[in-house]
């Protein structure tokens, strides 16, 4: 038995937690460089604002003065996400973190202790108490059905935010009301083909022939059908699989033409990638840098390139990774272009910093490297300040545009909200 716990309109909810004056008002969050809408409050949805809609389009609408807009505050969202997951860990037997705002919960044996819906409300209330965020809870025998139940919990207010779909009759009634496009893992393209075969609802899909589904689609969709029938095909993954690569990349707030600006950006991306690498307790062997101009720019020749540097000893020391990244940058930089995007990629991971060397290699790891990196990470996470490397520069004119950024309420002492 599974529960899927999902925060309602996560990004906008994170913003309104610290701005109670915005409760009940239309709020949206925009993507990198304040480009497109990536999160909407219920009130914003009711105005017809669509997900992915360019921000400049809603600026000129008659209702624009009533909308509260925020740039993406990833530090705030990550911190609140961690608090939500920690709360679920403390109240549940085991969980699988599925994304930044949702997690599957293992409810095996819970029926012997209390009604499943009661436990769902308990989780919901505890998350609200600890974080101020409202979640929806869907409960069922399989992950796919739990997703369906969660969809219903968030769609119909009468449910109170919790739907227990363990009853087969309730499953069939809900599936009959659910478009096949809304089933987990089925997008617009697959749903169109299913519609052409007369499969329009989740119930139609659940009652389809497994042989027909496997013939016209694949084993993944067959597994979805089995899950809709209550047959568990997907297990709870308590431990995330080890990452095969780490990418840190952003589009720039404006086109970069100077090497010094690009150098600062690459140093900053290398530092962030190194932090992520250490959080995974991994070491990398290859550091790659890519950059490119806009393929859509008028009267400009497109240029894009990538270069990699192999470290002799796998490392997660920011100094080593910055050094390799800047060496790679020198190999791909070409003057005369207006660059719109660049990034750093780390690959070839090791679980420790030891690798086989050639007989005459005398390279060794930096002394006290692990202790220094741990100290820097702790200081940067504490909110007491930010330690950065000189190559990143001070005035980051290349940084992505975030003109409507909210304070770092939970990660910076100077931004702590004052209780009144």
Please place each PLM-identified region on the residue numbering.
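Short, hydrophobic beta-strand segments
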Residues: 103-109, 306-312, 356-359
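C-terminal hydrophobic structural anchor segments
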Residues: 327-382, 387
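A generic structural signal for short beta-strands and their flanking turns/coil linkers
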Residues: 23-25, 133, 283-287, 305-307, ...
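Short, internal active-site loops enriched in acidic
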Residues: 109-110, 142-146, 292-297, 346-352
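Short conserved micro-motifs at the rims of enzyme active sites and ligand-binding pockets
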Residues: 300-302, 354-357, 400
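Gly/Gly-Pro- and Ser/Thr-rich, intrinsically disordered tail segments characteristic of DNA damage-repair
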Residues: 1-226, 235-236, 363-420
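Short Gly/Ser/Thr- and Asp/Glu-enriched loop/turn motifs at secondary-structure junctions
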Residues: 98-102, 140-143, 282-286, 337-341
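DNA-contacting surface of Y-family translesion DNA polymerases
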Residues: 182, 192-336
